[in-house]
Amino acid sequence: MAISDEPESVATALNHSSLRRRPSATSTAGLFNSPETTTDSSGDDLAKDSGSDDSINSDDAAVNSQQQNEKQDTDFSVLKFAYRPSVPAHRKVKESPLSSDTIFRQSHAGLFNLCIVVLVAVNSRLIIENLMKYGWLIKSGFWFSSKSLRDWPLFMCCLSLVVFPFAAFIVEKLAQRKCIPEPVVVVLHIIITSTSLFYPVLVILRCDSAFVSGVTLMLFSCVVWLKLVSYAHTNYDMRALTKLVEKGEALLDTLNMDYPYNVSFKSLAYFLVAPTLCYQPSYPRTPYIRKGWLFRQLVKLIIFTGVMGFIIEQYINPIVQNSQHPLKGNLLYATERVLKLSVPNLYVWLCMFYCFFHLWLNILAELLRFGDREFYKDWWNAKTVEDYWRMWNMPVHKWMIRHLYFPCLRHGLPKAAALLIAFLVSALFHELCIAVPCHIFKLWAFGGIMFQVPLVLITNYLQNKFRNSMVGNMIFWFIFSILGQPMCVLLYYHDLMNRKGKLD
């Protein structure tokens, strides 16, 4: 008899025994004497059986009890031979589930659930301890205060930014009709895009506005600038391809053009509100709007926005206010403040990412029936810093690839130079969005982004040397959540407080 890899289970043995077992005399007699098969019963018995439900129920119970007793007897008899002491218990070479060779092939769903339970328990205790020690720190003016009314110039500036897309549309319409030459079109677009970016900067610098209002305006103006550049660059490329087709230098089928060159105000208006930074005359659309799903996302957005406000007011503000400048004073105390700030800062950043990239952009896409909703990838699994920047913000990444990185390569620049230019542009915009609302130009954000370039080289080297290694992922999480962002928060906060102290 061949020995199988696993001992035969009791259930399998029971099934096999039931197939081999012959019917007993009792069961045979019961089968032929049952009321359903008996044909020579007297009419009185039939009348008696049909007239008495209690008698029928008692007979059925007796039959069921007899069958159960037979099954139990059979089970006990099979158990004697199902797993004998002589059956081999060890049949082949096996590794422990947590050994280095098999740990990544095992499912760790239970440990993941344990981490979730521990995380909830620990954070619940910290919240209760914080409330018992400091009380409720959230002020009534957190969401809105009378000081917000002084930011009306920023609000008017935000509304006036729609003028620049309209000006770009007029330029493109004139270029389509060949009323102005191509060099003039390029110069006009440079003027329009530059003005759309520096006009809000001047408004913020001239007004003593709140930090949140300034950041909101700068982010909005940067989005408008990126959209205008994409609009101008895409139409420029489509005009060039159309000229090649008209001259007969290229065939339309070989140019990979999914749509004809057409300047439409409707397509521009849709592009301005769509959750994308890359212009094209048409986009993939969904058939309808899911109203129930949309309502659930709105509820989630409100809840997580409240969670962010709670963490900022209850945790981050007290930690920052009781800290010192990280580059001055006691190094050990500064390190403790950075580490203490890292956890709530990470929670806020994750909530912000979830609220904006998942909830808000999906809500906007659902309202506009925008089909391509790959706004991010699994950046949390990034093994290198380069992978993180390529996956965490897909709208910006697609814009960089389409309008900056590949154009640099087409002009003969090496990949390293194109990558450096991409990080340089990103660093400039990070500095604008933070330094301008703070009225501080210390280049902390610029330096933090440019510091990613050597990290890209280091993590790429480690990934090539240690295949399938998570060393790069650990370095990314440490730099991102433990060192980088908390350090920037403390640097800008103390520089901002020093500036306000000098003004007072």
Curated annotation (Swiss-Prot):
What's its membrane topology? Multi-pass membrane protein
UniProt-recorded Gene Ontology molecular function terms: diacylglycerol O-acyltransferase activity
Domain of life of the native organism? Eukaryota
Q: Give the EC number(s) under which this enzyme is classified.
A: 2.3.1.20
Show the ranges annotated as biased composition (Polar residues). Answer: 24-41
Q: Where is the composition biased (Low complexity)?
A: 53-65
GO BP terms in the entry = glycerol metabolic process; triglyceride biosynthetic process
Q: Where is this motif: FYXDWWN motif?
A: 375-381
Reaction(s) this enzyme catalyzes, per UniProt: an acyl-CoA + a 1,2-diacyl-sn-glycerol = a triacyl-sn-glycerol + CoA
Report the function annotation for this chain: Major contributors to triacylglycerol (TAG) synthesis and oil accumulation in developing seeds. Catalyzes the acylation of the sn-3 hydroxy group of sn-1,2-diacylglycerol using acyl-CoA. Has a marked preference for oleoyl-CoA and sn-1,2-dioleoylglycerol over vernoloyl-CoA and sn-1,2-divernoloylglycerol.
Give the similarity note.
Belongs to the membrane-bound acyltransferase family. Sterol o-acyltransferase subfamily.
Q: What is this protein called?
A: Diacylglycerol O-acyltransferase 1B
Q: Which gene encodes it?
A: DGAT1B
